[in-house]
From Swiss-Prot:
Assembly information from the UniProt record: Tetramer of two alpha and two beta subunits.
GO biological process: arginyl-tRNA aminoacylation; glycyl-tRNA aminoacylation
HAMAP family listed in its UniProt record: Gly_tRNA_synth_beta (MF_00255)
The protein's name: Glycine--tRNA ligase beta subunit
Compartment list: Cytoplasm
Entry EC no(s): 6.1.1.14
Lineage: Bacteria, Pseudomonadati, Pseudomonadota, Gammaproteobacteria, Enterobacterales
GO cellular component, one term: cytosol
Keyword annotations of the record: Aminoacyl-tRNA synthetase, ATP-binding, Cytoplasm, Ligase, Nucleotide-binding, Protein biosynthesis
Amino acid sequence: MSEKTFLVEIGTEELPPKALRSLAESFAANFTAELDNAGLAHGNVEWFAAPRRLALKVANLAESQPDREVEKRGPAIAQAFDAEGKPSKAAEGWARGCGITVDQAERLKTDKGEWLLYRAHVKGESTEALVPNMVATSLAKLPIPKLMRWGASDVHFVRPVHTVTLLLGDKVIPATILGIQSDRVIRGHRFMGEPEFTIDNADQYPQILLERGKVIADYEARKAKIKADAEEAARKIGGNADLSESLLEEVASLVEWPVVLTAKFEEKFLAVPAEALVYTMKGDQKYFPVYDNAGKLLPNFIFVANIESKDPTQIISGNEKVVRPRLADAEFFFNTDRKKRLEDHLPRLQTVLFQQQLGTLRDKTDRIQALAGWIAGQIGADVNHATRAGLLSKCDLMTNMVFEFTDTQGVMGMHYARHDGEAEDVAVALNEQYQPRFAGDDLPSNPVACALAIADKMDTLAGIFGIGQHPKGDKDPFALRRAALGVLRIIVEKNLALDLQTLTEEAVRLYGDKLTNANVVDDVIDFMLGRFRAWYQDEGYTVDTIQAVLARRPTRPADFDARMKAVSHFRTLEEASALAAANKRVSNILAKATEPLNDIVHASVLKEAAEIELARHLVVLRDKLQPYFADGRYQEALIELAALRAPVDEFFENVMVNAKEKDIRINRLTLLSKLRELFLQVADISLLQ
């Protein structure tokens, strides 16, 4: 069967830059699935994406499906014919469905009976006939939240479409996709190269587009060029470019022919906190800031043009003129804001609603202030500093700088607090109260910041759950999942002695009578334990290990983490599977027991050597392990408990638990309950698979 290279390119208006990669990757995944479902043999599927195009190139695509033999079994002979040998209605209906008459059917004999059988040789459809619908289906499945319609057409897509190129080798596959007739025409760069040209063979892509159209269609190559050129440009001025992955991706999605240039701004703007300058450079202008080797911002920035200019100084000058007013605004806001102390903004917080039922930002500030102080007392942080940080925590939201540059919240609070002469740990806490903002983000660096960050998040969790507005599906407008995971990460990774039970109760208490959900404390804790499940799964822990610990519902996160590590280690022990099975057996036996058990195991009632030996081991271990459990040394405890494998095996091999004599039976059940209680001090080992 012959094979050829296949190309599809959809030429569009400028595609959303933040969605470009996902659109291309989804297009490739969807089309690959279509090929596989159709049984079309193919090689590597490459995707290409630039601001005005999405393309796929498939190597070694078969020109048709393979022929195949089809067998359709019909009714059993007994049901296919009546007593006179005439075909039944069921047989005739089946035959019509196969396109034959009953007498043309074969018969299939097996040891279970005889049936009518239809065999046919089905010729595979041509790729040319199959591909148009496959492309259309793949495009229809793209993750596009909002579709556009253009002109008088009823066609909908993410952006208006101008060209559709469909080539199998050197042949155009005729089709109408997204309202456009397929052709071999490709559009180049808007201002460089050939605006439009034809491609003779799919193998020429993307090289022909690079050479004639001045477009780098390979997304990764374009991104790599920007990164390399920006690093070199920064090196030439003695600095290091801030090439964050998200901005690199966005810039690579904005240009077809990247040209990296270096510009500068006035040094006087460096008196403004670097975060505000960086915010406007990266967020508004898509520029890359440059730092010196000590991490200090330089009065330069790197940007990416989409054209090779004969006079790049004009482009540089233009960008410098664009950014200057934004930096001047930041300078003005910074100087204006510093004329007031942070706490002078407290009254204005009363004018901003946090949530309709939960009050204003001033109300939230009062709760955070109290809760941060309470948490500080629990973890050994400075209570006065934590309380002060809580009071000032939202004041920077009322400043000119944060109003204009919203992403500078927190960090500007830190700078203004330093200007006001606040304690350093208070100032740092104002910046770090929102950490961690995302997976892998840094945690608050000092105890006061930890107290404030936990207080802020717990206040939100208690309040929103308290009015019954917990997250549903993908909707989480108050970012409660992120808040819960943030609290857990801080407590676990900083090893803080906090209990979710008392922490949540205190957060709820501070709301007074505003909350309507009577089960708010349990709901918040259950939600946070659910976040634990997701966290540990991402860390690579097995589901049954997580369930074994969750079954005990430990509410101290640091303690939960210690149990997880202990059970995970226990699973590696030779005795683990046997003891897990034994615990499961004990659990089932105790679940079926209906008689009240004794408080203790009575040694005088023990008869068999195996039960006497098991009881002896339990007494020794119970006394030995109490300090382990008290100190949270769960891994050591489980290693000690692993020694029970032999006496437990002996017990089940030689002892009849449900003895006829009531006192012996109850004593043995009590012995098993004491065994189970020891393991349950750590986790429910019976849940391990």
